[in-house]
Amino acid sequence: MHPENRDTNMKRIGEYRKLLGVDQSATLKDLKTVYRNTMKDAHPDKFVNDEAGKADAEEKSKSVIEAYHFLVSINPETQEKYKEEYTETITQSIIQDFYLEKSILKVQHFNGKMYEYIGVPRNTYIKMVNADSPSRFARRHIYGNFIYR
């Protein structure tokens, strides 16, 4: 993985964890508890006659929601829950389409499943574009090498 892409994506994950006040060992239950408590404190409806406070709360709420959903999607418990489905997709369904957006490789399979691989360097993506079989390339160089959701 290219160091700057890895750093950018790891920084994003770190910022999300910091926002929610959790570390990488947080369970789904921990994430849910922190999310609910944070949303209670930052919910825009708490700021009835305070437009500035309401606007700040809306921004914080959006950030908290984004962080929560992202961290849940990469959590080991979530990945374990969907491991069988993921394994079946990457071994039995060929790639229909794929594209790179801000070092996130989005891969659409013919079975309708889409996965995002975080921190994929542009040069790896270009090699995948030029590969005879993007599915085989992904099995060898993408799957198992990058955080996915």
PLM features: what roles do these ranges have?
Residues 1-14, 24, 59-72, 79, ...:
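Short "pre-J" leader segments immediately N-terminal to J/J-like domains in DnaJ-family
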Residues 85-149:
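Accessory regions outside conserved functional cores
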